[in-house]
Amino acid sequence: MASAPRTRSRSQSAARRADAAPTSGGAAPARGSSSARGSVTPHLQARSGRGGSFALQRLVMLELAAALVVCGWLVGPAALVPAGVVAGILALLAVVRRRGRSLPEWLGSQLALRARLRKAAGTALPAGVDSSLAPAVECEPNLRTYQYSHRDDHDRRPVGMVGDGGFLTAVLQVEADAGALRAERGRTPLPLALVRDVLDVDGIRLESAQVVVHTQPAPAPHLPQQSVVVTNYAQLQAETASPAVRIMWIALKLDPELCPEAVAARGGGLLGAQKCLVRAAGHLSSRLTGAGFRANVLTEEELSAAIATSACANPMVTSQADQGDAPRRRTEESSRSWRCDNRRHTTYWVRRWPQLGGSGVALPQLVARLTAVPALATTFSLTLARSGRQDVAVTGHVRVTGRSSTELSDARRALERAARQERTGIVRLDREQLPGVLATLPLGGAR
């Protein structure tokens, strides 16, 4: 049964097609039960607002420009001049690009950013929101948390959920073993086939399953190179490049409209949707446990804490926010970064994957190298969603975090350098940083 709501992330990033996908610092190619659904190699598709959609828009504008010139020529000199001017403007819009984007797309993203900034300035934080969840609520005001309690078994842990009235998400925290700090990065890979298979369980069709890997380097980048901590970690880092913190979450997102029969069979409404999500989360938890992992479905309080951890919210600010009478806004978006408390973030979209498996880089190694850059924290998000009957759409995002603008700039350069070395194409989401952040929080992935 559900408690009263406390607080849909809608990222505009579209998906890439794959039979499955790359994943965490303990991730690997998924192998399904049938050969047709075997190993995982992403095949890029167009992102919304980029790629194929822009190519079509450019073709239409060029054809329209040519048609205007022809019509003006047929009508006569009086019509040819204005037709030529309009055709020239259309051609410029089709051909000229600013920062790698078409002019219409660039203008659209700029207007969208201004609209979000105006909305943020005029939106107050709802009363009663948990301070741990407040940064996410500032990004998506409709977010609320819920708690589902098992009526028939009071010894079972309650299940926490987050949603905006249109979706519900439950989160599992997954650990490989107690020696993960010194383990080789790919020694215990996450079986992505299990994550993929949970998209459809007992008629429950999930919108997406998201793997989030949150890492903090060892030692922290702000420590001087001659410090004792840096010296002591040098040998360990040379052997394994192990982070100080590596947390893996799997967020399961349910849109009740995708499986109305399953929701109705379990009572309908919010309760029916919660039962569907609990069934899917329990199924994945059981299968991961059987594969040798420790998987815990988070409670409401743990879920809020996980979102705060992923957002790198300052614990001191979070604790003080509960004591103040009038909560102050803790987040701010700019064209190239997003700020939460005194930490700054920049999110990238994975536009091009390298060759994976075989003679190429292994998935666990790729993710580990991208998240090993010197930064306060690095977050890698991978979202799997159904695309047709057999296909799985894959979306990847990477977010780096720094304590200052200078530290963030250094982290950005390090990430871009690491991506080039791994032959991975990443695109900084200029003017789309807030949607990018929402795509990297454990809320269920990009929309």
Language-model features and meaning:
Residues 1-131:
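N-terminal alpha-helical membrane-insertion module
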Residues 95-190, 200:
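N-terminal topogenic membrane-targeting module
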